[in-house]
Amino acid sequence: MTQITLTTPDDWHLHFRDGDMLGETVPATARLFQRAIVMPNLVPPVTTAAMALAYRDRILAARPQGSNFEPLMTLFLTNNTSAQDIIDAKAAGVVAGKLYPAGATTNSDAAVKALDELFPIFEVMAQQGMLLLVHGEVTESHIDIFDREKMFIDRYLSRIVEAIPSLKVVFEHITTKEAAEFVAEASANVAATITPQHLLLNRNDLLVGGVRPHNFCLPVLKRNIHQHALQAAVATGSSKFFLGTDSAPHEKHRKESACGCAGCYSAWSALELYAQVFDNLGALDKLEGFASLHGADFYGLPRNSGTVTLVKQEWTVPEEIILPNGNPIVPFFAGQKVNWKVKTA
């Protein structure tokens, strides 16, 4: 197959950041994706309906002229989140609440420190029809970073799902065999997103032959057995797994430093890289469900009506992109060849 046409896809997990950065990130995603679930981990975090609406306005202002791209907003859950916060957010069009264990990722220090205290909030979310999006890692310093996802499933996620079966839960950016199995075996109200980097790479790509800071993300890349389990999950075509890039931009100097930031900025190549993965797996027929259908269905939103066409044509991801403030950012897969390319009119 040398060409494939898909229903216009959506990105069910990304980071736009804020300020000048929106001038880069919003057009990069809007070029292909109709909708995107926007993460709320700004400084300060998006904890109220009013903050979500204001952030949405800033994103809309950064859309390219003529674009009808739609940002889908989320609420940053903390131990101070109230039932009224959830009700107000739902009324304002916020589609989901995001659970970050405190310290799990960029700008998450204000997040949840006592998870059990949030169960009443999860109940309200279920009643309101608001989804729970989960960064599924424990954060205690004595727990090995490669074990934190499995530990979160055992300690928390299994209990949340069991206690509130009507709550729709997205286990975001899963990275392990255990996570893929948990989602596959859970009820129809549990799904997961998978990033391009966790399908394409494993921890050798981070650590062998030198540290590769632009492959560093959280949750961290795992052993190849976990990479293969994720590939197997998407190759089944199961509606429980769908596209979420976790595209997460950081300026070059913040990645290439003594204490580099976590995140892969994949917006310029994500769909093409997913196509490469599915092609390599002999599962191109499953790409449309993963990229364009399963997420919308799980969120209870209409499927998109447009289409995007990819052709089998080699191109090279740019080494750098210059941000509106003049600083460079290194995109994911920089300088590497990709086998699929979006067909432009």
Swiss-Prot record:
Coiled-coil parts of chain: none
Residue positions where N6-carboxylysine is found in the record: K98
Protein name per Swiss-Prot or TrEMBL: Dihydroorotase
Biological pathway: Pyrimidine metabolism; UMP biosynthesis via de novo pathway; (S)-dihydroorotate from bicarbonate: step 3/3
Keyword Hydrolase attributed: yes
Active site (UniProt): D246
GO cellular-component term (any): cytosol
Cofactor binding mode and count: Binds 2 Zn(2+) ions per subunit.
Enzyme nomenclature, EC number: 3.5.2.3
Protein's job: Catalyzes the reversible cyclization of carbamoyl aspartate to dihydroorotate.
Cofactor(s) recorded in Swiss-Prot or TrEMBL: Zn(2+)
Annotated residues for binding of substrate: H15, F16, R17, N41, H135, L218, H250, A262
Amino acids binding Zn(2+) 1: H13, H15, K98, D246
Family: Belongs to the metallo-dependent hydrolases superfamily. DHOase family. Class II DHOase subfamily.
Enzyme class of the recorded protein, top EC level: hydrolase
Single GO BP term: 'de novo' pyrimidine nucleobase biosynthetic process
A GO term for molecular function: dihydroorotase activity
Keyword Zinc attached: yes
Keywords, alphabetical: Hydrolase, Metal-binding, Pyrimidine biosynthesis, Zinc
Reactions it catalyzes: (S)-dihydroorotate + H2O = N-carbamoyl-L-aspartate + H(+)
UniProt superkingdom: Bacteria
Subunit (UniProt): Homodimer.
Positions annotated to bind Zn(2+) 2: K98, H135, H173
